[in-house]
Amino acid sequence: MTLQPNLQAKEMELSLVGLQNSGKTSLVNVVATGEYSEDMIPTVGFNMRKVTKENVAIRLWDLGGQPRFRCMWERYCRAVSMIVYVVDAADTENLSVSRSELHDLLSNASLIGIPLLVLGNKIDIHGALSKEALTEEMGLSSVTSREVCCLMISCKNPTTIDQLTDWLVNHSKSKN
């Protein structure tokens, strides 16, 4: 009889927040199924989905982005492995609102120290901001109470989604 190595899965719990139409639900679906769909309906309240990538079990909380749901973001961001803030990098008209909502969320004492991953989504759209411009517009350099990372993705581009999931898996393994 040979002993199998203990390949106990690592676990990650992520809350995906951001303004409505930033691509949170599309992102969850692409990470879970590998397929993108144009036919998304706005999330009412929240949805939760579990996926496993490279022996890492990831629980994704997809939170509604409409103004009436933003008051619940903080509650679902407590005690998670990471807050994932999704921004439509092509929607420059709403960046100031997105920045304000992000900084309001991060000002909650219950969330101090929880790592932040900002995802600039929809980079396939002409006029989408660069990583540097998004970092500046979102005021990420002023966020000092936690680890902060910014990645640029398109839910329509499997390569960027693979890079994101690789980053999440590696981040999970480096923390455990």
UniProtKB/Swiss-Prot annotation:
Family from the record: Belongs to the small GTPase superfamily. Arf family.
Alphabetic keyword roster: Cell cycle, Cell division, Chromosome partition, Cytoplasm, Cytoskeleton, Endosome, GTP-binding, Lysosome, Membrane, Mitosis, Nucleotide-binding
GO molecular function, one term: GTP binding
InterPro entries: Arl8a/8b, P-loop_NTPase, Small_GTP-bd, Small_GTPase_ARF/SAR
GO CC, alphabetical: late endosome membrane; lysosomal membrane; spindle
Record's function text: May play a role in lysosome motility. May play a role in chromosome segregation.
Annotated protein name in UniProt: ADP-ribosylation factor-like protein 8d
Protein localization: Late endosome membrane; Lysosome membrane; Cytoplasm, Cytoskeleton, Spindle
Superkingdom as given in the UniProt entry: Eukaryota
An example Gene Ontology biological process: protein transport
Entry binding sites for GTP: 21-26, 40-43, 62-66, 121-124
Organism of this sequence: Arabidopsis thaliana
SMART domains the UniProt entry points to: ARF, RAB, RAS, SAR
Keyword check for Protease: no
Known partners and oligomeric status: Interacts with tubulin.
Presence of the UniProt keyword Cell cycle in the record: yes
A UniProt-annotated Pfam family: Arf
